[in-house]
C-alpha cells in the first residue's frame, strides 16, 4: 500500500481521535479534529459500534498512522517482532520506536514524526557521523544522531529545537540542543511509551487471526 498523501487532519477524524500528526498545530484552535470530531464524508457522524475485528483493525491503523509506516512495512515489523524472543507487543513497539525518524522526533529536532521523516529523507541528519537519508533506518542503543552542520540554520529545525527545550524527554533518549546532538540510550519498555493511544495486544490479535 502506498503512503497516504491526502489531508493529514483527515486521518485523525477517520480514527476518531487526535493523533497529533501536525505537532504544535494540534494544540491550537486551528486543529481540524477539534472543529469536526467525526469521520469525514456524508455519513461521518453516524459512527457505529465496532466489531472485535474492527477494533483490532483500527488499533493497527492508528499505530501505523502515528508512526507513518506503510502497510507492508508495518506487517514486516510485526512478523519480525513475532520471531523475536520476549513479548511480541513490546518487540513491535521497540522496532518502530528505534526508527531514526522517530528518534529525531523524540529528541526534539522536529515538531512531528511526519516532519522528522521529511528532514531525514532530505539528508539533514547523521548517525555516528555518517549521513543518513532513510527514515526507517534502525538505530541501536548508543547510536548518536546529529543535525548536520549545514542544516542547523534551517528554520524548521531551529523552531523545533526552541519548542522542545521545555518539553519532558522520554527516558530512552538524551539530547544536547547546544551541539544539535542526541543519543539513543536504550530500547523502551512497553509501559514507558505512554503517548501511544492503542491496545497493542489488539494488533497482535489482528495479525494472529
UniProtKB/Swiss-Prot annotation:
Q: Which UniProt keywords apply?
A: Ribonucleoprotein, Ribosomal protein, RNA-binding, rRNA-binding
Q: Which GO terms describe its cellular component?
A: small ribosomal subunit
Which Gene3D superfamilies does this one have? Ribosomal Protein S4 Delta 41, Chain A, domain 1, RNA-binding S4 domain
Stretches that traverse the bilayer: none
Q: Which InterPro entries match?
A: Ribosomal_uS4, Ribosomal_uS4_bac-type, Ribosomal_uS4_N, S4_RNA-bd, S4_RNA-bd_sf
Q: Which SMART domains match?
A: Ribosomal_S4, S4
Pfam families cross-referenced by the UniProt entry: Ribosomal_S4, S4
| Role this protein plays | One of the primary rRNA binding proteins, it binds directly to 16S rRNA where it nucleates assembly of the body of the 30S subunit.
What family classification does the UniProt entry report for this protein?
Answer: Belongs to the universal ribosomal protein uS4 family.
Q: What is this protein called?
A: Small ribosomal subunit protein uS4
Q: Which organism is it from?
A: Pseudothermotoga lettingae (strain ATCC BAA-301 / DSM 14385 / NBRC 107922 / TMO)
Ranked from the top, the taxonomy reads:
Bacteria, Thermotogati, Thermotogota, Thermotogae, Thermotogales
Amino acid at each position: 500500500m502506498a503512503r497516504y498523501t491526502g489531508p493529514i487532519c483527515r486521518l485523525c477524524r477517520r480514527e476518531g481521535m487526535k493523533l497529533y500528526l501536525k505537532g504544535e498545530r494540534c494544540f491550537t484552535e486551528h486543529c481540524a479534529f477539534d472543529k469536526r470530531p467525526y469521520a469525514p464524508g456524508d455519513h461521518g457522524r453516524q459512527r457505529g459500534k465496532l466489531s472485535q475485528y474492527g477494533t483490532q483493525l483500527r488499533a493497527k491503523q492508528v499505530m501505523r498512522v502515528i508512526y507513518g509506516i506503510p502497510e507492508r512495512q508495518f506487517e514486516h515489523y510485526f512478523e519480525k517482532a513475532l520471531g523475536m524472543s520476549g513479548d511480541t507487543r513490546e518487540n513491535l513497539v521497540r522496532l518502530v520506536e528505534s526508527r531514526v525518524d522517530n528518534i529525531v522526533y523524540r529528541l526534539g529536532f522536529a515538531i512531528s514524526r511526519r516532519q522528522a521523516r521529511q528532514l531525514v529523507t532530505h539528508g539533514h541528519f547523521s548517525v555516528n557521523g555518517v549521513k543518513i537519508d532513510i527514515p526507517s533506518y534502525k538505530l541501536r542503543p548508543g547510536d548518536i544522531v546529529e543535525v548536520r552542520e549545514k542544516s542547523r540554520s534551517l528554520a524548521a529545525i531551529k523552531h523545533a529545537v526552541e519548542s522542545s527545550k521545555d518539553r519532558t524527554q522520554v527516558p530512552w533518549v538524551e539530547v544536547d540542543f547546544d551541539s544539535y546532538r542526541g543519543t539513543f540510550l536504550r530500547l523502551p519498555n512497553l509501559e514507558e511509551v505512554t503517548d501511544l493511544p492503542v491496545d497493542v495486544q489488539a494488533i497482535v490479535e489482528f495479525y494472529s487471526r
